[in-house]
Amino acid sequence: MEEPQRARSHTVTTTASSFAENFSTSSSSFAYDREFLRTLPGFLIVAEIVLGLLVWTLIAGTEYFRVPAFGWVMFVAVFYWVLTVFFLIIYITMTYTRIPQVPWTTVGLCFNGSAFVLYLSAAVVDASSVSPERDSHNFNSWAASSFFAFLVTICYAGNTYFSFIAWRSRTIQ
């Protein structure tokens, strides 16, 4: 007794998508926001980049490895300098409008808040490590880097405030 063979009929539907399709927009050209640099947050980001560059180059040009505390200052200064340049590029090219999946106001608040706290600690460490008795040859560079570290800290505090205002206005809506 053989069972009759039934015709197998299965419908299979497949779709193909790519990760890049989720981030595509209608235009392929980059936008450029000229007005961003004229805003106070834009000005503060440029100031953070310039002053942060001064902080780590003034230390890097010395024999900072003799004072272990300057390792922390160098880490914070270089790390946040690179990330701030990255964020400036994102803001100027308006890349944040092309990636709406990222909560940019929250990212900005977390970035600026952490930069403020860590730069404040680095500035205090920098200032407390400067001593003319320790190394008179590097004293001026280290003292100047300490001064600029506090200025960068003030800039990050300002951007933290503006990021908080933007974040709060997004969460209230």
From Swiss-Prot:
InterPro entries: MAL (IPR013295), Marvel (IPR008253), MARVEL-CKLF_proteins (IPR050578). Highly expressed in liver and pancreas. The keyword Plastid does not apply. GO terms for molecular function: cytokine activity; structural constituent of myelin sheath. One of its GO terms (cellular component) is cytoplasm. Keywords: Chemotaxis, Cytokine, Cytoplasm, Membrane, Nucleus, Transmembrane, Transmembrane helix. GO terms for biological process: chemotaxis; myelination. Residues 36-168 form the MARVEL domain. The keyword Membrane applies. Pfam families: MARVEL. The chain crosses the membrane at residues 40-60, 70-90, 105-125, 147-167. Belongs to the chemokine-like factor family. This is CKLF-like MARVEL transmembrane domain-containing protein 8. It comes from Homo sapiens (Human).
